[in-house]
Amino acid sequence: MKSIYSHARVRTLAAAAMAIAATFNAHAGFFIPKDTTMVMGMITPTESMTETAFGITRDTSVALGVSTMTNAARSYRWQMVHAQATKLVGRVFNEDGIGNAYVFAGPLAARAVEARGYGRDFDGTRYGAHAGVWLDYETRRYYGRASWHGYKTSAFAWNETITQAMVAPYLADYEDVATFVGVQAKRRTDEPQTEVTPYLRLFKKTWWIDAGVSVNRAHRRDVFINLMHTF
């Protein structure tokens, strides 16, 4: 009986993990189950993104998205269009939770937008690539994530590192609304401070909402919102 219960519990955790696999900064690294479509949007004062992804196999998804990036000093701003393939390269189950490892990469096109008082840092459209790695571990009570995402064109190179840690104040079944509270730490190229953002996550089956406010000096009171829906 214990063995049957344990296997059922792992299957439930696996279903939950695939439905709510963490993102985004947000953003890149989402894994989408086969034949599932995901639409998401993320916005902060220095970043925004909209993306649509589709799961083509059990361990591979593809995506198209549009994003905007601004540095903390607001001295330059880029708009990008990207395509992406995400591959699940490792998954570890135990009685309490699931660990996942993803890699992702794809082409991008970027152009500079005039920043107030600074102008553009390059002209025309520049083409390049982006890639990254995403590691996470989840139980019904705890969630942790570490990711790296790099962008490269002839005009700029940009890296972003994110760590997240969350805890659920109560245990929720997969059919119910679940709540996590936690903190995100993000470090971006050429920025002297790590952006620290306490935030709240709500999710249920096919939808997900993140909301938080940054507290470090360079990003103080910057609001972070991330929305996701699968169908």
State what each model feature region is.
Residues M1-I32:
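Cleavable N-terminal export/targeting peptides
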Residues A28-T197, W207, V215:
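Outer-membrane pore/translocation modules
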Residues A83-A85, L200, H219-F231:
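Outer-membrane beta-barrel "beta-signal"
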Residues F203-K205:
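Alpha-helix capping and inter-helical loop/turn segments
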